[in-house]
Amino acid sequence: MSQILFKTKTFWYGIALTFCIATLSYFLAKLPFLMILGQLVTAILIGIIIRALFPVPEKWFTGIQFSNKVILRAGIILLGFRLNLVDIYHAGWRVFLIAALCLSFGITIVYFLAKLFGVDKKLAILVACGTGICGAAAVVAISPQVKADNNQTAVAATIIALLGTIFTVIYTLIYPILPLGPDGYGIFAGATLHEIAHVIAAADPGGSSAVDMAVIVKLTRVALLVPVCFVVAKMVNAGTKNRFSWAELPVPWFIFGFLATSAINSFGIIPTSVTDFLVICAYFLIAMSMGGLGLNVHLPSFGKMGGKPFAAALIGSVFLSAFGLALVLLFHLAG
C-alpha cells in the first residue's frame, strides 16, 4: 500500500506544495514585519491562507499528511544535532515536573469546561488530550481508546490545529514583554502549546537555547502519551466487556531518534560544520510540516462543528498558559 502511495502524482503534489510553502516562508520571514514571527509561524499562516483562498485537491492531502507526520518527525530527529544532553541534566527535575503538571492541568481543565458546556464525552476527551499532550497526534492516538468516530476525531484535530496556531502567533508577539529569559520562555512554550511544531515555532524568537528547552519539555509531554492512553482506555472500558489491549497503545518512537542524535552531538562525534547543516535541514523539514499544518485548518468547518468544544479548548488553553507561566516563575526558572 505504501509503495502505491509513493508512486501517485497527487502524493508528490502535496509534498511539493509544502516544500514551496517552506521555501516561501524562508524568504518572507526576512521581511521586517514578519521577522518577529519567524519562518515556522509564517509557514503556518501561508498554509492557512492558501487553504482559505484556493481549492486544494483532496487527493493532495496524502502528501500533505506525510509532511505533517513523517517529515515533521524527521525534522525533530535532525534537530537533536544541536542539543547537548549535559544541558538537559542541568535543567533538573523541576523542568520535567512542570511538563507533567501542565499536561495534567491541561487535560483536566479542558475536559471540565467541555462537559460544563455540554460537549459530547468522547469529543471532550479528544479535545482535552489534544490540548494537554501533543495536539492532533494525541487526538488520533486517543480516538480508538474512546471509540470516537471519524467526524469527532476530525473536529478535535481541527480545533487543536487552529488554537495552536493562534497561540503560537500570540506567544511570538508577547515574548518581548514576558518576564522570561530564553530558557524560561522555552520551558513555558514547551509546557503549554499544543503541537510539537507549534512549540518549535513559538520558541524560535527566543533563540537556540529557547528552542532546545522547549523541545525537551514538549517531548516529555509526548512521552507521557502512552500512560495517558492507558488510563483513558481503562476509564472508558470500566464496567464494560471491552478488553484492554497493550498493542493498541501508541509509542512515539521518534523520541529515541531525537535522543540518539542529541547524544551524538553531545559527544562531538560529528564536526560542527556538519551538524550546523543538519540543523538547517531540520528547520526546513519542520517548516514543510508547518505548511501542512496550516493547510489542514479548514476555517468554514467551524461553522458546522459548533462553538462549544472550540470555546472550551480556547478558555482551557488560556488557563493552561497562565498556569504554565506561574509554574516557571514559581520554580525560579524564568532566566
From Swiss-Prot:
Coiled-coil intervals, chain numbering: none
Family annotation (Gene3D superfamilies): 1.20.1530.20
Superkingdom of source: Bacteria
TM regions (residue ranges): 10-28, 33-55, 91-113, 123-142, 155-177, 251-270, 277-299, 309-331
Keyword Transmembrane helix: yes
Keyword field contains Nucleotide-binding: no
InterPro entries: Na+/solute_symporter_sf, UPF0324_pro
Membrane-topology annotation of the record: Multi-pass membrane protein
Location relative to the cell: Cell membrane
Record key words, sorted: Cell membrane, Membrane, Transmembrane, Transmembrane helix
This protein's GO CC annotations: plasma membrane
Family: Belongs to the UPF0324 family.
Protein name, UniProt field: UPF0324 membrane protein LMOf2365_2179
